[in-house]
Structure formats: structure tokens, C-alpha cells
């Protein structure tokens, strides 16, 4: 297999990018989905409409699939990864702790989903359980990202006095600091992006009526649009900060400006597509645009990871 991939570098690059994009997209979607489901439950209670509660249950089911896939896939990945790390290394302990915390998040999410009907007469208790699940998921996300950061940086030529805290601490103006700014908004946008497509796929299985999907798909699309708009504004600000010194110094190349412009415009597309779906009276007809939005938002994981794994020593 390795010889085959060595003879096909394009395929090797595609697989390498997919190995970053797919797990990271699923991780953000899973770790943020409880925030979305709890919001749906609260909104359903306030508006006295069952649409949002049913949508929250559908999204919680999606969370089960994402969570267990991440947990099993992460265990397999760690098995092969740790074979190349000396036994007793602190990295192994860090990896195992991150995986166990992720496992706790999956278990809490499973309990939250399984007790949905049992705790239906006690919505406050169920919402409280969802809040605990959401907090646990946020902790799991931060630990896993810290683990990925450490794993990416540890093999770089670091100074001997570099500490783990320095590896994790951001430096203003670096790609790593910018990536950290994206995290809370990606955690809100990705579950909604997955949720829009998931609701389309569940249309036949969960026949709650056309009015249900005409209500909840625009709600998910609006959630994704708002969160992704902030991601895009952060990207725009980062691009301006990156190009301003070059422009002032007269060293800005046309290729750099074009690349930055394409990057900014590319990830504006999901905002526009979600905006149209959120405002549409017939959101079920937006299957293609919602799918394209999901794909583009997943592709953003690649530059995000590159920023997360970049290294700039503390001044």
C-alpha cells in the first residue's frame, strides 16, 4: 500500500488532507451539537412549538453517530500512533487523557439522548443534563486540540528551555493565535452545518410533516450563517493584518493579494448559501446549496489545522 501511494503522490496528498478535514469537521460538529440541541429545547418551550424539540432530538441522534465514530476512530489512530512513541512518554499520557475525556463526552451525550422520552415530563432536568453534556464536550474539544497542537509541534526544532505551556500559549499576530479565535464559532457553525444536511436525509425516516422541516431547516441554516459570518470576519481581519505590513513596505506581491482575495471570497460562499436557505419559504429545495455549504465549511478545517500546528516562539 505504501509503495502504491509513493507512486501516486496526488492520491497521497488527497488522503492526507482528508485525514485532517474529516475528523476535525466531525469533532467540531459533535462537540458543539449539545449547545444546539439545548437551544432547540429551550426555544421550543419558550415558543410552545414542538418543532424545535423534535429537531433537537434529531440532532442529538446525529451526535451519537459522530461521537461513537470519533471515539472508535480515535482509538484505532492512537494504537498506531503510540507505537512510534517511546513507552512512558508524557505524550502517551496526554493522548490517553484526551481520548478518555472525549469518551466521557460521548457517554454523556448518549445518556442525554436515551433519556429524552423518559425525562419528557421534566424538561428542566433534561435541559440541565444537556448543559452538562455541552460543557463536557467543550472540555473534550479543547483537550483534543491541545493534543493535536502538541503532537504537531513536538517534532519541530524547539529551544531546550521551551515548556509545554509555551507550546500552547498563543503569540499575538501568529496563525496559531488566529486559529484559536476561530474555535468557539466553528463549534457553533459546524453542528448546524451538519444538522441542515442531516435533517434533509431524515426527511423520509422522520415524517414530521413539511411544516416541521420548513421551520427547523431555516433555523439551523440561520444558526450556521450567523456563526460562520463571525468566522469569515475573523478571516478577513487576519488577512488584512497579514497584508498591511507588506502593503506599507511596498513588498506586496500580486500573487499574495490574489490568494488572500480568493481565500476570503471562497469562505464567504457558505454565508450566502445559508442566508438564502434561512430566508427561503421552501428550504427543502436547497439540498444542493446546503450540501455545498457543508463541504466548504469542512474544507476550512485544513487551513485551521495548519494554523493550529504552526509554531512561533514566544518573544
Q: Where do the PLM segments sit?
A:
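N-terminal signal-anchor module of multipass membrane proteins
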Residues: 1-58, 62-63, 67, 310-314
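Alpha-helical transmembrane segments and their helix-start/interface "positive-inside/aromatic belt" motifs
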Residues: 14-22, 51-64, 120-141, 215-225, ...
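Hydrophobic cores of alpha-helical transmembrane segments in multi-pass inner/ER membrane proteins
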Residues: 25-37, 100-115, 181-199, 263-276
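Membrane-interface helix-loop-helix modules in multi-pass inner-membrane proteins
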Residues: 64-130, 233-271
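Membrane-helix interface motif
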Residues: 75-85, 145-163, 236-247, 308-313
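Membrane-interface transmembrane-helix boundary segments in multi-pass integral membrane proteins
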Residues: 175-179, 249-266, 292-293, 312-315
Amino acid at each position: 500500500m505504501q509503495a502504491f501511494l509513493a507512486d501516486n503522490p496526488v492520491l497521497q496528498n488527497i488522503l492526507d488532507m482528508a485525514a485532517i478535514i474529516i475528523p476535525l469537521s466531525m469533532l467540531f460538529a459533535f462537540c458543539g451539537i449539545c449547545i444546539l440541541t439545548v437551544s432547540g429545547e429551550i426555544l421550543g418551550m419558550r415558543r410552545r412549538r414542538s418543532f424545535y424539540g423534535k429537531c433537537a432530538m434529531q440532532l442529538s441522534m446525529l451526535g451519537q453517530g459522530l461521537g461513537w465514530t470519533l471515539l472508535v476512530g480515535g482509538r484505532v489512530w492512537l494504537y498506531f500512533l503510540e507505537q512510534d512513541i517511546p513507552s512512558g512518554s508524557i505524550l502517551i499520557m496526554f493522548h490517553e487523557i484526551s481520548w478518555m475525556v472525549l469518551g466521557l463526552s460521548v457517554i454523556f451525550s448518549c445518556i442525554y439522548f436515551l433519556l429524552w422520552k423518559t425525562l419528557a415530563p421534566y424538561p428542566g432536568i433534561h435541559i440541565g443534563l444537556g448543559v452538562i453534556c455541552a460543557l463536557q464536550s467543550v472540555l473534550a474539544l479543547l483537550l483534543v486540540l491541545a493534543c493535536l497542537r502538541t503532537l504537531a509541534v513536538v517534532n519541530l526544532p524547539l529551544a531546550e528551555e521551551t515548556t509545554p505551556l509555551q507550546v500552547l500559549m498563543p503569540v499575538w499576530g501568529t496563525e496559531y493565535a488566529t486559529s484559536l479565535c476561530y474555535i468557539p464559532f466553528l463549534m457553533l457553525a459546524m453542528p448546524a452545518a451538519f444538522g441542515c444536511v442531516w435533517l434533509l436525509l431524515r426527511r423520509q425516516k422522520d415524517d414530521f410533516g413539511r411544516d416541521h422541516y420548513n421551520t427547523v431547516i431555516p433555523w439551523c441554516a440561520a444558526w450556521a450563517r450567523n456563526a460562520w459570518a463571525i468566522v469569515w470576519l475573523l478571516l478577513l481581519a487576519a488577512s488584512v493584518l497579514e497584508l498591511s505590513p507588506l502593503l506599507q513596505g511596498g513588498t506586496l506581491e500580486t500573487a499574495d493579494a490574489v490568494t488572500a482575495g480568493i481565500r476570503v471570497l471562497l469562505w464567504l460562499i457558505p454565508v450566502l448559501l445559508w442566508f438564502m436557505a434561512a430566508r427561503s419559504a421552501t428550504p427543502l429545495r436547497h439540498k444542493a446549496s446546503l450540501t455545498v455549504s457543508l463541504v466548504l465549511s469542512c474544507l476550512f478545517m485544513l487551513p485551521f489545522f495548519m494554523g493550529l500546528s504552526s509554531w512561533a516562539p514566544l518573544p
